[in-house]
Curated annotation (Swiss-Prot):
Protein location: Cytoplasm
A single GO cellular-component term on record: cytoplasm
CDD domains cross-referenced by the UniProt entry: S1_EF-P_repeat_1 (cd04470), S1_EF-P_repeat_2 (cd05794)
An example molecular function term from Gene Ontology annotations: translation elongation factor activity
Originating organism: Brucella abortus (strain 2308)
Key word Protein biosynthesis present: yes
Descriptive protein name: Elongation factor P
Record-linked InterPro entries: Elong-fact-P_C (IPR015365), NA-bd_OB-fold (IPR012340), Rib_uL2_dom2 (IPR014722), Transl_elong_fac_P/YeiP (IPR020599), Transl_elong_KOW-like (IPR013185), Transl_elong_P/YeiP_cen (IPR001059), Transl_elong_P/YeiP_CS (IPR013852), Transl_elongation_fac_P (IPR011768)
Keyword Cytoplasm part of the UniProt annotation: yes
Protein family (similarity comment): Belongs to the elongation factor P family.
GO biological process annotation, one example: peptide biosynthetic process
Coiled coil location: none
């Protein structure tokens, strides 16, 4: 579907320079001299590279609709992650580097959304929040209450995040998978 350059919004996926790009940020610019344009920060869906482009209002670009399917995470096999389509029960194998650092958050039976373009997976979305146990946390130092301070803690999946001083080893916490930050106690 063709759209004008000034209609590109964050989250839109477009075909540009022979690749698929997602708009991360957009900024409509109206200079005093010359025509208005849309300054767009793009991220390549395949290799993750970023690009800044200007699109004039008269320019048209191809907007791509991605198919989104729900999959359930089954298990890990070496460098491969195995998922199952919840509708057809077909299995899908993705490499760990496709998922990236967030692969550590995958748990048995976790529901994820896989984005497909022409039946080929190009992206994966994990739940925004997961509940994990703290395996290691520094003890609280008395008298550090003047300012809010966070201490480092290690989650059961090995990822280090800052947590409030009252969190101890063994407690379960809710973690934001996008920002890798503590949200609350579970």
């Amino acid at each position: 579907m063709k759209i004008n350059g000034n209609e590109i919004r964050p989250g839109n996926v477009i075909e540009h320079e022979g690749g698929l790009w997602v708009a991360v940020k957009t900024n409509a610019v109206k200079p005093g001299k010359g025509g208005a344009y849309n300054q767009v920060e793009l991220k390549n869906l395949i290799n993750g590279t970023k690009l800044n482009e200007r699109f004039r209002a008269a320019e048209s670009v191809e907007r791509v609709r991605l198919e989104q399917k729900d999959f359930s995470f089954l298990y890990e096999q070496g460098e491969a992650l195995i998922f199952m389509d919840t509708e057809t029960y077909e299995q899908l194998e993705l490499q760990k580097d496709f998922v990236g650092d967030r692969a550590a958050f995958l748990q048995d039976g976790m529901m994820v959304t896989v984005e497909l373009y022409e039946e080929k997976p190009i992206g994966i979305r994990l739940p925004d929040q997961v509940t994990l146990a703290i395996t290691e946390a520094d003890p609280v130092v008395k008298g550090q209450t003047a300012a809010s301070s966070y201490k480092p803690a290690v989650l059961e999946n090995g990822i280090r995040i800052p947590v409030p001083p009252f969190i101890a080893s063994g407690e379960r916490v809710i973690v934001d998978t996008n920002e890798l930050t503590y949200i609350s106690r579970a």
